[in-house]
Amino acid sequence: MSMQDPLADMLTRIRNAQMAEKSVVSMPSSTLKVAVANVLQGEGYIAGYQVSGDVKPQLSIELKYFEGRPVIEELKRVSRPGLRQYKSVDQLPKVRGGLGVSIVSTNKGVMTDRAARAAGVGGEVLCTVF
């Protein structure tokens, strides 16, 4: 069976691993997943990530906890294959009044909503993190 939405699979694996209090979660790697992991690490939501393997690359994400609780409280897919969500720079959503971040795929790469506003670009809102 082919995977219809690899990014949703990635987010679900992260949520499930955090509920099971795992320290590392692995999944098949892709360019988009690595870009999202890079943004999550830059924002401090994960401890790190690593891509290993040549034939079938695997993405391993090291999860982050604070006082025994996961750092990521909420991880939601916004744009999905059946209903893409494209927003201009003025329409980019603020997550919980600016406390969380939206991850946006722009023509300048995958970045947070704050970085997209600073660059003056809109794009596809991939997911929200709080």
Curated annotation (Swiss-Prot):
Known SUPFAM superfamilies for this protein? Ribosomal protein S8
Q: Which GO terms describe its molecular function?
A: rRNA binding; structural constituent of ribosome
Q: Identify the keywords attached in UniProt to this record, alphabetized.
A: Ribonucleoprotein, Ribosomal protein, RNA-binding, rRNA-binding
Q: Which Pfam families match?
A: Ribosomal_S8
Top-level lineage group: Bacteria
Q: Name one GO biological process term.
A: translation
Q: Which family does it belong to?
A: Belongs to the universal ribosomal protein uS8 family.
The subunit field of the Swiss-Prot or TrEMBL record says:
Part of the 30S ribosomal subunit. Contacts proteins S5 and S12.
What is the protein name for this chain?
Small ribosomal subunit protein uS8
Source organism of this protein record: Stutzerimonas stutzeri (strain A1501) (Pseudomonas stutzeri)
